[in-house]
Amino acid sequence: NNPEPKEQWGKTLRGDNQTLLAFPDIYADYWEYTYSYKDNPNIGLRLTGKFPKSRFFNFTVYNDETQIDVSSIEDVNIQPDDSSINPYVKETDDYGANGYTIYIIPANTPASARASMKNVCEFPEDVNMVSIFMRLYLAKQYSGDEYGGVDMPAIQAFDVTTGEEVDFLKREVCNIHESLNLPPMDFSADLPQLPFMRAPLSLMYPNSPAEYLFARIKLNEGEVATFRFIPPTAPKSVSEYATADVRYWSICLGSAETYSYASIYDEEMPKVDKEGFVTFIIADANSAKLPDLQAKAEANDGTYILTWNRKEQGDGILALYRNMVINENYPHSMRKLMESVPLAAAGGDMSGFNPMKMIAMLAMGNWGPQGYKFSEDDFLSDSFNYANIRRMK
């Protein structure tokens, strides 16, 4: 007595169409199912699906009232069903021929019931509202459709004490559509230097394998905002998933309202300059000099232009540098080298601010992004030196 899988989940939450707040990645799609555990005690969920074709895929369970994650499972850790393989571990052309089963259960589920469960995400039994998110990165690019070429996983509710299946539980309204706890963002500071800091990630339905560095930018008329760093390696195939520095990395630009308008991801940036750096130039989409700026960027290896429409999106920009699934052996991991900036600092209270650990260039060296704002004419001049982008004064 269950609806079709696509009807069980909420509609596709797309990073690319300005319907999602909280600076989503444009190349990610999300789906959410939320139910009231308070009204349905002892009820867990069994998800059965086929592996979607994408760069990255995971499930995260949240306490919907706090928007904090309580458990998650990543693609490579999902044990496949009998006679299936996991295409994120073993290369195959046919992802969708392979099935998986995931259990989402309260912490008080009896051991006897757990004995036969392979993939378990649990939540504390004092959670009132349980939200399950499924995320896919680059599904459209890899499979041609946002679902990764397969149906959504089917949701079956069951009683964890008896094992008996029960009717589908009504999907409640998830807070991601309503009241996100967004920190105050102040874009009024107009310094030319653009330091990057690690985002405080316990907010707004964080994706646990992801880490973010951000810089707040006020882009004035006639200016370009620039930043550069040495990027991590990303995999070209499944066989490189275990050895690449990160599974995926991207740069996204979001507005003061926290919508995302521009993204570029690793595969779209095949080149670095002779020192191993990538350089980003954020230019006003309405600038008369845009063709000249683009020509100058194209003439320099590893330099990429991102356009920003100041007229429509305002002059406040949040630049986000995202790393997904950071390799434990990567020596330049932002997760290991940087401390998150305290929320108080976003509001201006700098008492808990430690620059050596909280400014990317100081904590991560050349691998930490650092930027500078120049006039368009300065950038276009023959004497422009890319090394000046990372100066702190």
Cite the ranges covered by each PLM segment.
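A compositional/structural signature for long, glycine/proline-rich flexible linkers
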Residues: 1-393
